[in-house]
């Protein structure tokens, strides 16, 4: 994470605020590559003081501080360099962001914010960045068997439909709504990531007419299988209805 010419020049523990402060600096006379065109050995123009939240040191919050250089490139002019321990314009180190991304699949972002003592708005920024980056690199060329189900995203009737690669147990697409157009949007996204709608052989879903219609219209070679949970749910509801009718009789 920390590479030459960067080095730790001082560490201070703030007893009052119970946090560790780490100060970084570059070696005098250092030159840096241009962040835009890559030209090597650009001279330092000036510096900007910046700080980043880092992984905790034991139970104590840790912050890193550095004079980040602006270089003068003969091609691009004055540019702020990229530091090796953080993304551009991020207030967190890469290791702290990695920790957030490790927690995100298993708990709400609000709970993460409480755990790390950061506002959830700040946490959503790196989450959105890394999810977008991962989505752009996603390859769905081998997706053949898909499961789809809807879930309520908020109180009320705001639904999200989630599509899962059943062979890899991996979510490949999520979209608002639960009508037949959700399958159409899945098909479009599948194509954008190297997938083939005609290569989908199986779809597992509930008995929603909307999902059935969407599959028939957009995944022509897919065989629909109703998932066990919804089949048993419908069966139990029918048994309960018969029982009520018998009790009335």
Where are these regions (language model features)?
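Short Cys/His-rich Zn2+-coordinating modules
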Residues: 11-23, 48-62
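Short, positively charged, Gly/Tyr-enriched micro-motifs
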Residues: 38-41, 51-158, 198
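RNase H-like nuclease fold core
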Residues: 124-202, 209-214, 241
């Amino acid at each position: 994470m920390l590479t030459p010419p960067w080095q730790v020049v001082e560490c201070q523990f703030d007893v009052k605020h119970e946090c560790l402060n780490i100060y970084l600096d570059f070696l005098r006379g250092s030159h840096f590559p241009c962040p835009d065109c890559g030209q090597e050995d650009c001279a330092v123009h000036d510096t900007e003081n910046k700080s980043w939240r880092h992984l905790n040191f034991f139970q104590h919050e840790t912050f890193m501080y550095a004079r980040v250089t602006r270089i003068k490139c003969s091609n691009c002019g004055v540019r702020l360099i990229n530091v090796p321990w953080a993304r551009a314009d991020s207030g967190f180190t890469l290791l702290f962001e990695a920790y957030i991304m490790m927690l995100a699949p298993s708990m709400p972002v609000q709970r993460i914010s409480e755990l790390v003592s950061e506002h959830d708005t700040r946490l959503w920024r790196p989450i959105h960045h890394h999810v977008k980056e991962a989505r752009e690199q996603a390859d769905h060329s081998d997706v053949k068997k898909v499961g789809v189900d809807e879930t309520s995203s908020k109180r009320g009737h705001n639904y999200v439909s989630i599509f899962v690669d059943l062979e890899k147990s991996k979510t490949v697409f999520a979209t608002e709504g639960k009508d037949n157009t959700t399958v159409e949007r899945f098909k479009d996204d599948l194509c954008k990531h190297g997938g083939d709608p005609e290569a989908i052989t199986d779809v597992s879903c509930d008995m929603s007419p909307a999902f059935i219609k969407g599959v028939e219209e957009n995944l022509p070679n897919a065989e629909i299988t109703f998932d066990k949970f919804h089949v048993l749910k419908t069966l139990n509801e029918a048994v309960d209805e018969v029982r009520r009718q018998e009790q009335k009789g």
